[in-house]
Amino acid sequence: MTNIRKSHPLIKIINDSFIDLPAPSNISAWWNFGSLLGICLALQILTGLFLAMHYTSDTTTAFSSVTHICRDVNYGWVLRYLHANGASMFFICLYLHVGRGLYYGSYLFKETWNMGVILLFAVMATAFMGYVLPWGQMSFWGATVITNLLSAIPYIGTNLVEWIWGGFSVDKATLTRFFAFHFLLPFIISALVMVHLLFLHETGSNNPTGIPSNVDMIPFHPYYTIKDILGLFMMILILLSLVLFSPDMLGDPDNYMPANPLNTPPHIKPEWYFLFAYAILRSIPNKLGGVLALVLSILILIIIPFLHTSKQRSMTFRPISQCLFWLLAADLLTLTWIGGQPVEHPYVIIGQLASILYFLIIIAIMPLAGLMENHLLKW
């Protein structure tokens, strides 16, 4: 009798994706983040579902409903802080996952990579709308500033912004629709994740050497299931440490003040995981230019496969490209720091230089380094 694991139409799909999946024998801990992202998504959907049972998306009661969750609902504070800090863990894993793809040349699986970029945009949109829901000061002003950026679009900009707002300012209609979309998008993301995995399993995983590993594959279970569980425990340890010891460390104190359209906070800034893009936006004095730079800072990932000039796939054996990669990582950390600082000297000029460097490294310096390494290796 055939094993049900291999014959049942549904269980067979799970088996081929997570149990008998052939995986390269040499993939490192950098390949753990895909499964961690899946767990983060499941955690966010679960905690979000329970929070939605107690939350009200009305401008008069939204802030107090979040307070009610924290004070009166059984373990409501755990749910709220798991959800808020779970988003931070989600983005840490996301950025490390993208960084791994850049370093090891995984972007040459174009369909998987492009699907990943779409997923990144979807997760960013979801996180932005989620930040608006507690209806604190930073929620309200963040929503106002970011949605207002669309008014930079020529001709239709103003109409588009008012259409998104559902009125002439961020108000009840905006909050209600943001809640609806924030609830819906994670399920769309789940579907996109399945497409992402479908494309990945068409080609199989890349590995640290960048050399095809068809000759040396091992089953995903038990080797990588146990490895992923170790990564999961480490992530849960960090997440629970955040939630139980310093739940507000990554948040903004201004969000503990109810939204007030008549009082602008001194420094409007998004959550830490958007600061690098916010710094790029602010570094350009022109509104439309800033918006374009903001969108391109993420959209540039789409063209990375076409900028690959090296004869080698991975950066493992390319020291010049490695130095540039870590320079890019340092540059992104600098941009993240600048995004949280006020718009004054010397932060403005540092932000502008870091923004120029970001685009220069990706568009020009890295492709040139690839060509140079080919020449050095007499290829």
Curated annotation (Swiss-Prot):
Residues that span the membrane, as ranges: 33-53, 77-98, 113-133, 178-198, 226-246, 288-308, 320-340, 347-367
GO CC field: mitochondrial inner membrane; respiratory chain complex III
The keyword Membrane appears for this protein: yes
GO molecular function per UniProt: metal ion binding; ubiquinol-cytochrome-c reductase activity
Cofactor binding: number and manner: Binds 2 heme b groups non-covalently.
CDD domains: cytochrome_b_C, Cytochrome_b_N
Subcellular location: Mitochondrion inner membrane
InterPro entries registered for this protein in UniProt: Cyt_b/b6_C, Cyt_b/b6_C_sf, Cyt_b/b6_N, Cytb/b6-like_sf, Cytochrome_b, Cytochrome_b_C_euk/bac, Cytochrome_b_N_euk/bac, Di-haem_cyt_TM
Biological process, per Gene Ontology: mitochondrial electron transport, ubiquinol to cytochrome c
Cofactor section: heme b
Name used for this protein in its record: Cytochrome b
Species of origin: Pipistrellus hesperidus
Gene from which this protein is expressed: MT-CYB
